[in-house]
């Protein structure tokens, strides 16, 4: 096997890649050894005898494994947390999601006749004031106070 370092250097320049990314066809060593000009190298590139290998990317295998574990609640303990609680879960978004769900539930109860418009307005204002932590608490309150009517 002959020394092809000069050809590798020329090929790297022609292909505009680093020398480590230059690939030579193992079956065409003698043909490559005869190529001594840039034009010769360009012809071999056109033939497919010399090519540039793809760049090495970062493997996402470990990231996928970690994401899978986090999706079912692992790796989320106190030692893994860096931001404050409000940075990890936005308090405003949490509030907005909760109040929208409660208001939707109140609308449904009003529309199906469980609540009168006056009761609906009273409950709406209570929800707005933070009286209910969740839709479940709101539903329990309705059942306890307005369930008979």
From Swiss-Prot:
Pfam families: Ribosomal_L19e (PF01280), Ribosomal_L19e_C (PF25476). Disulfide bonds: none annotated. GO terms for biological process: translation. Keywords: Ribonucleoprotein, Ribosomal protein, RNA-binding, rRNA-binding. One of its GO terms (molecular function) is large ribosomal subunit rRNA binding. Residues 74-85 have a biased composition (Basic residues). Gene3D superfamilies: 1.10.1200.60, 1.10.1650.10, Single Heli x bin. Residues 62-73 have a biased composition (Basic and acidic residues). It comes from the Archaea. InterPro entries: 60S_ribosomal_eL19_sf, Ribosomal_eL19, Ribosomal_eL19_arc, Ribosomal_eL19_CS, Ribosomal_eL19_dom, Ribosomal_eL19_dom1, Ribosomal_eL19_dom2, Ribosomal_eL19_dom3. Part of the 50S ribosomal subunit. Binds to the 23S rRNA. Belongs to the eukaryotic ribosomal protein eL19 family. This is Large ribosomal subunit protein eL19. It comes from Halobacterium salinarum (strain ATCC 700922 / JCM 11081 / NRC-1) (Halobacterium halobium). The gene is rpl19e.
